[in-house]
Amino acid sequence: MDCCETDGFKRPVEIRDKPTLEKTVRRRGVLKGTALVASAVPFVAGGVKRGAAKSATIQLAFCSQMLCVPPYEVTRDGGYFRDEGLDVQLVYMRGSTAATQALVGGAVDYAATSFDDVLQAVNRGADIKRFYSTARLPLLALAIAPNKATEINSFKDLEGRTIGEVSRGSLSESMTLFLMKKAGADGKKVTFAVLGPNIYEPVRLGQVDAAWVTEPALSLLVKEGGKALVNFMETDDANKYLGGRYEFMGVSVRTAEVAARREEMRALTRALEKGLGRLQRIKPEEITAALPKQLVEGVDTAQLTDIFSRYRASLYPTVGVEDVAACERVADTLKFTGLIKPEIKAEQVLDLSIAGS
């Protein structure tokens, strides 16, 4: 689920002369090389080592979408990885799917990705386990183009319309069809247009009638006269349309390494739990300040801070133990459109023995 492609933020300029994984970057890094994994975010966010770690560097890859980043950078900034004896290198990827591929391919030790990507990877034969949650709602809203805002007021109104998406076979496509069916609408009457990463402008210009976006694209479209038909970054909409919490971002590991890494995994979850608590306590400005300069270069930081202030309570849990029911809701959505086999169960890809232990 490449929600990082739909946020409306400009991405850092590619740094082409940086080496790949063999170069150590103390606190944050980048995975380069399309031969290794497709769609990596090629920028290095430099950090300063804050203390001696007891263990070797571990690499944790994750999506570079702005709303995915805070739990990990706030944890790092608070020194909680270091306090647990961990030397964690945060590896910024261009999307959740790329981070999942890096984990499955053995390029990184852990990956923080959307749960739908984990399920789809397991469906394709990958052997990975999800063991900790850092975002409990999908970072998505169905934005209506400004020129259609008065015409589209329900999922039934999507019949005969064109909806933009980054790529075919995505969670957003499944979610559209799933929600249309629940509303009694005919999903066969909607057209999906593949727009690639630059999805904001086509919606703003009315080249498509609607599209699944995240922030700040949603706020920018609202300023232009658009609106959200549904915003799953808000608890009320998630409860109304999805039935409650809907598992999104969290950390996974290769199943074969669980036994050897168990204590390390527990230390990682303890650090992240402290980071999630800090994320709710500190000022929104401090969240923005914790992000790497390369990531926020050219970004309206005041707007970004407002977004963190608005959504942090709804998006980020204070306890990262996996909610099995929330995970099953994701699986049900994917099964509806055949993205995973009917026999795939969310619980089979979870390791519930780590968090809280």
Where are these regions (language model features)?
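N-terminal secretory signal peptides
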Residues: M1-R26, A38
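Short, glycine-/small- and polar/acidic-enriched structural segments
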Residues: C3-C4, A53-L195, P202-L205, D209-E215
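N-terminal export signals
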Residues: E22-K23, G29-K49
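Short, solvent-exposed loop/beta-turn-alpha elements that line the ligand-binding surface or hinge
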Residues: D83, E234-G244, A313-E322
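Sec/Tat-exported extracytoplasmic proteins
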Residues: A107, A112, V122, T162, ...
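Pocket-lining segment of extracytoplasmic ligand-binding domains
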Residues: N198-E201, V208-P292
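Secondary-structure end/capping motifs
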Residues: V258-L339
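Conserved C-terminal helix/tail region of periplasmic/extracytoplasmic solute-binding proteins
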Residues: E328-S357
